[in-house]
Amino acid sequence: MLLLSIESSCDETAASVVRNGREILSNIVASQISIHADYGGVVPEIASRKHLETISIVIEEALRKADLPISAIEGIAVTRGPGLAGALLVGISTAKALAYGLNIPVVGVNHIESHILAIMLESDVKFPFIALAVSGGHTHLYEVQAIGRYRTIGQTLDDAAGEAFDKVAKLMGLPYPGGALIDRLAAEGDPRAIKFPRPLMHEDNYNFSFSGLKTAVLNYVRKNPAAMEGSALNDVCASFQAAVCEVLVSKTRAAVIQSGIKRLVVAGGVACNSGLRRDMATFAETEGAELFIPSPLLCSDNAAMLAVPGDYYLCNNIACGFELDALPVWPLDAISLTGGN
């Protein structure tokens, strides 16, 4: 099947053409980072308006890059949620209009499910596996039995890891988005310079909490103004990043060991972080676990990742049809309960 995928859940407008749910023919992403940087974060109304301005151009470019006419498309997958309601509706309305005009099926897929399954565009990952989905809006651990069968085993109780990165960057005066910049500065710092807390790390569960860590960094920089300059800033970034990564690895290690599932997927925007990738690789080697992390392009928001679940659901006649609407809050467990969508 030649599938057109459309992603507009937050601040990237993306479209992709994928063959048979695995072969990427094009993957186009239009970012709004420079627009939202002036506000220090994503402004939902602005994001929606930019999606409206950009989505047709992005789809046309995806088709051009794939060297295909729109008439060759056999199905459409679109992000249904979770995400910003207005942003989601831009993608959904576009997908439904195209599907209606072309007389082809359309399916709404889960954004986090797509992140978790994106690795299948690059690697042959067998089920079951443990998945850590870690991004600006989510930090969750799942047991994944098959496409459409997910069980949440742990989640953040407050801030997501990516949210913590961006908030800490903002309080230190770093430009938005701050996560990638913290990663770069951390590479030049000493991760042992400052002993920041590791919230919930020693509790007997798989949940996360990062708000206390964020507050600890805030208190430190207020008491130590000199920490905002030069090598001292690098040390703060390195110490903060080390704390986040240690918690993520510790909880994931516990889930892998206690479940007996020695196969792990790390997905989402924070999976681009070099420290997390390194620490996860070290843990996996020590425990004899298979580790799969997508390439950075497939970790950040994109449309190609929708093709893995989208192709599966369409080929198995699990399609939303034209009644699909936005689900700004859409837990993966709900997919399992409804047999797909």
From Swiss-Prot:
Keywords: Acyltransferase, Cytoplasm, Iron, Metal-binding, Transferase, tRNA processing
Predominant place of localization: cytoplasm
GO MF: iron ion binding; N(6)-L-threonylcarbamoyladenine synthase activity
Record field: transmembrane: none
Binding-site list for Fe cation: 111, 115, 301
InterPro entries (UniProt xref): ATPase_NBD, Gcp-like_dom, KAE1/TsaD, Peptidase_M22_CS, TsaD
Superkingdom: Bacteria
Record: residues binding substrate: 133-137, 166, 179, 183, 273
Gene3D superfamilies: 3.30.420.40
Record carries keyword Isomerase: no
Gene Ontology CC annotations of this record: cytoplasm
GO terms of biological process kind: tRNA threonylcarbamoyladenosine modification
Catalyzed reactions: L-threonylcarbamoyladenylate + adenosine(37) in tRNA = N(6)-L-threonylcarbamoyladenosine(37) in tRNA + AMP + H(+)
Cofactor entry: Fe(2+)
The protein's Enzyme Commission number: 2.3.1.234
Subcellular location: Cytoplasm
Free-text cofactor note: Binds 1 Fe(2+) ion per subunit.
NCBIfam families: gcp_kae1, T6A_TsaD_YgjD
Role this protein plays: Required for the formation of a threonylcarbamoyl group on adenosine at position 37 (t(6)A37) in tRNAs that read codons beginning with adenine. Is involved in the transfer of the threonylcarbamoyl moiety of threonylcarbamoyl-AMP (TC-AMP) to the N6 group of A37, together with TsaE and TsaB. TsaD likely plays a direct catalytic role in this reaction.
Family: Belongs to the KAE1 / TsaD family.
Name of the protein described by the UniProt record: tRNA N6-adenosine threonylcarbamoyltransferase
Organism of provenance: Geotalea daltonii (strain DSM 22248 / JCM 15807 / FRC-32) (Geobacter daltonii)
